[in-house]
Amino acid sequence: MADADEYSTAPTQQEITPLQTTATIINAISGECITTNVDFFVSLDKFKQFIARKWKIPPDQLLILLPYGNKLKPSMFKELLINRSFTLNDFYVYDRRLFSLVSKPTPTNLLTSKDSNPMNSPNSNDLTETLEYLIKNSHISQYQGSDTIMIKPMPSPLEDADVDLSRLNYHSVTSLLTTNLGWLSALEIDVHYFKSLIPDIIAHIKRIFDGLTVCSQYLKLYCFDVESLYNSNVQFLNQLVDNGMTSKWEKCFNDTLSKLTALEGDSLQKFINIESLLENEKSVKILNHSINGKLNKIKREIDENASFRDIITVNIDRLRQMFTPNESKFELEDQMAESFEVLVSEMRTRSRNVLDKEEEEFNSQEFLKSMNVMLEKDKKESVKTLFTISQALYSQIGELIDLKKSLQKHAVAILGNIAFTQMEILGIKRLLLNECNKDLELYKKYEVEFAQVEDLPLIYGLYLIEKYRRLSWFQQILSFISNFNQDLELFKQNELRTRNKWVKNFGSIATVFCEDLLSSSDFKRLNEYHSHTSPPNEDEEDENENSIANYRQDLVKVSQAIDNYMTQIKETDVSEPIIDLLSKTLFETKRFHIIYSNFKNNNNNSSNGNSISPEGSIALKSDDVVKGYKTRIKKLESLLHEFQYSDIGHWPQGVLNTHLKPFRGSATSINKKKFLGASVLLEPANISEVNIDSVSQANNHQIQELESNVDDLLHQLQLLKEENNRKSMQISEMGKKISDLEVEKTAYRETLTNLNQELARLTNEEQSHRTEIFTLNASFKKQLNDIISQDNEKIEKLTGDYDDVSKSRERLQMDLDESNKKHEQEVNLLKADIERLGKQIVTSEKSYAETNSSSMEKGEKFETIPLAEDPGRENQISAYTQTLQDRIFDIISTNIFILENIGLLLTFDNNNNIQIRRVKGLKKGTAQSNILDESTQMLDAHDNSLIKSPVFQKLKDEYELIKSVANGSEKDTQQSIFLGNITQLYDNKLYEVAVIRRFKDIETLAKKLTKENKIKRTLLERFQREKVTLRNFQIGDLALFLPTRENVNSVGSMSSSTSSLSSSFSSVDLSTPPPLDAMSIQSSPSVIHSNVINQASISGRDKNKLMRPWAAFTAFEESTRYFLKDEKGLTKGKEWFVGRIVTLEHFVADSPSNNPFRLPKGSVWFQVTAVVVSYQGV
């Protein structure tokens, strides 16, 4: 029963914790979605490849977002696969190319009309062109429901049928009803299709809105990181400003450092570089202003970016309001669909009933009348109602599809706004990371330098205390070394006395087996270890004492300096915590001492008897002291005995049957220290008091060592316990990891099972695909002949077009060069004419002014003189005035002719004001005229009939009128009008501005022509580079390579006349099936010949396994063959390939060694090598 319960609870537990790994992948632009199992994909790259194959999006252009705007990363996808903690996930897929329509978000870029242009900005034309380009290149068109096939419903055949009673019979009724039933079935299918499309398209539109919202959430998350970075910079700057020492360091420098003295007696101000700090203070002020300016600018940009995001959100909400279909609108369609079903059912039932009738029943007139009534009713009511419902549904679907397409265009515009906003915030992020961070680091560096001024009293005080501690330490170390040397010498003297006594008592007998006891090599090693060749003498001891005294004096001096410093610092403005810290540190330093042996004080009796006081001698001679030392010795011996037996390493061999001896190394080191004073413990009972005192001191030292060893052992035991606990924790953690790995292993096994199932399905699909490919290859062979013939025609056409384009290009280049030269000449001539005419105008104006003034003076004189008195002078003035008028008219004519010669016409506007405008074809009449001066291309002075300007015609009429009018007041009036019209032309610089503008237009046109010629030249070069050569191959040409055919007369033999590898159509037979493998042509024709002969001897059953050579396709050259030299297996697995020829080797088929392919004798053939450019696989 226990087993049964165990098995029964397993499925229940599995139901409690289901592992659902399905995911919904949503195309954010088309609104389509697919559901798949994430276990099918082992990595994010495989997941992207699946999406790329589904929606034809390149994997590097994929952007996948999660519902809250997080970007899907490989680590996140891997975590989803491992944890398997989700039941249903939505992945929103975007094509990065649709973000290329970058535009600034504006609140007016969405109009109230759904069909309006989504671009409403200063660059709307460019943005619209970019959108059209994206649609044209299928970046958007593939998302606009191009797969949705809409077939418009057709009217019923009953509408055009004649259902009069006289025309009704069995055959007409059955034919009409059968045809109508077919139409009814087709219409029903269409209506069901339309009805199913409505919720699908509405769901697509909602998903597009969801995709826009998720993308806006992604933008907000991205911008939030940048805003957090900005806030951290502002917070850091505020901390620097609030806690900075920019304005406080000078007070500390003057009030505090000036009152504190150093060891040398100077103030602490000498350690501060005041010039550098002042310069840094100025730099900090400038830097603070600069950082605040940058941060304020960044704040404005962030606020502007936030307004862009708000605009995007508002635009998305507007889109949602404008493009969300009203679901109540489709309630009528649902009712119509229900009535459609009822009508179709009734109409089909009536038709079936009639068709089930026998032919004899149609002879009854009553039955035919009932048929007439039924058909008339169906024709007028049922058919029209059904067709109206289908038309309504069709139009509704069309509106929804148009609505979705318009929404997609607006969505692409929104994506462009999001891309623009992200680029702006990215620039802000770079500014924060590059510039602001550097400025803040520099600001922080300056503040640290200022803070060091306030910290200098504390640091210098700590420096003095540290110096005192080091001197104290060194003085104590020297004292310890001096005392230790004396103790060591005492130990050595005692040991020498003990050894001499032992040798004296037992040496004569023990020399037989222990000669090493008679030597003193261990003392030599001890001296070498201690770096003393001999025991120290009195001079060295005096030097040590002097050095210790010197260090003690230095220590006292530093101590006095510290006391003085502490007194001074308490009188300054230094904070109490700093003073307390210095006092505490000084107190702890003075308590610092080195513990060392006091053997010198207790054993000077044996080394220097003169230095022992009488009280010490009395104490050493006391019996109580001797008894006390003997008691201590016994206690020490018992302790040593217990310690030795507690050490497992010193037990006899075999007592403890184990190979594990803990702390073996430590016990060895302890034993060595323990028996350091063994010779002292073995002294006889009647040892002298001095030796007893030495032994006591040695035992004290030994006890200290033993205690320290015990402490070390306890410490090691504690460390081992901690290590044991740590190992236990690691073992438990490893156990958890192993269980996790077991779970992961189970998950991977499930994944592998799913993958195996998917692999089996793919294998079946691959087999079906291979069958389909085989059938396609058969059709391809038929189509290849047609393609080749079409390609030949295209090649001929392209060759002719290329020649035409080359000629036209040369002609255009020559025309362009000639036009450039003519334009340059015209520009130079016009510039010279302008300068000359300007000078003439200035001279004419001066002469005209002088003439007027002189004429006025002469007129005054002539008023006093009667005309009869001086008629010659009057004639002279009239002749001079007439000459001046002629000269001015010639200048005006020449200027107007220059304008017309460059395509500009001087005319009047609607307000009768003079204007100069561009007129096409104006120069043709001038160019066709033969009255121009060929050297200057200027107008003949005696003929101005070519000038078409109405202004000139008016001036000409005025000029003729002046010439025809006799001298008098009327002539003066006409002259004033003539000069006024001329002045109107030159006063506003109308002539100069028009000429300069025209020459700028000519230069622009020349640049445009040059650019167009460059584009045409590039196009021609590309055509030349990509064309396939069909004859007269050269190195570098592109050629089509195909397997050759072989003509076999019988099953086992190959005729020499018909087995040639030549073809009736060039060197390739296109009807040959693709080879199983390509023949590898060796480096020499003789080897090829031997291979062909060997292949000819193969039995008929191996005929299909022969490897045929490949040759280049030649359409117009039947006498020359181009065989492929395939050394690298280029043809393996290929049906044909296009390659670029690398080498050509010429051969003549004049001998068997040079004719491996059995070509006609004397034939010319080439052996070529090529590199593959493109190919078709088998």
UniProtKB/Swiss-Prot annotation:
A single GO molecular function term of this UniProt record: molecular adaptor activity
UniProt entry keywords in alphabetical sequence: Acetylation, Autophagy, Coiled coil, Membrane, Protein transport, Transport, Vacuole
Domain of life, per lineage: Eukaryota
Gene3D superfamilies attached to this UniProt entry: 1.10.287.1490
One Pfam family this sequence matches: ATG11
Protein's membrane topology: Peripheral membrane protein
Keyword set includes Acetylation: yes
Summary of subunit composition and partner proteins: Homodimer and potential homooligomers. Interacts with ATG1 kinase. Interacts with the ATG19 cargo protein transporter. Interacts with the ATG34 cargo protein transporter. Interacts with ATG9. Interacts with ATG17. Interacts with ATG20. Interacts with ATG30. Interacts with ATG32; to recruit ATG11 to mitochondria. Interacts with ATG36. Interacts with YPT1.
Primary role: Involved in cytoplasm to vacuole transport (Cvt), pexophagy, mitophagy and nucleophagy. Recruits mitochondria for their selective degradation via autophagy (mitophagy) during starvation, through its interaction with ATG32. Works as scaffold proteins that recruit ATG proteins to the pre-autophagosome (PAS), the site of vesicle/autophagosome formation. Required for ATG9 anterograde transport from the mitochondria to the PAS. Also recruits the ATG19-prAPE1 complex to the PAS. Required for the Cvt vesicles completion. Plays a significant role in life span extension.
Protein name: Autophagy-related protein 11
Gene: ATG11
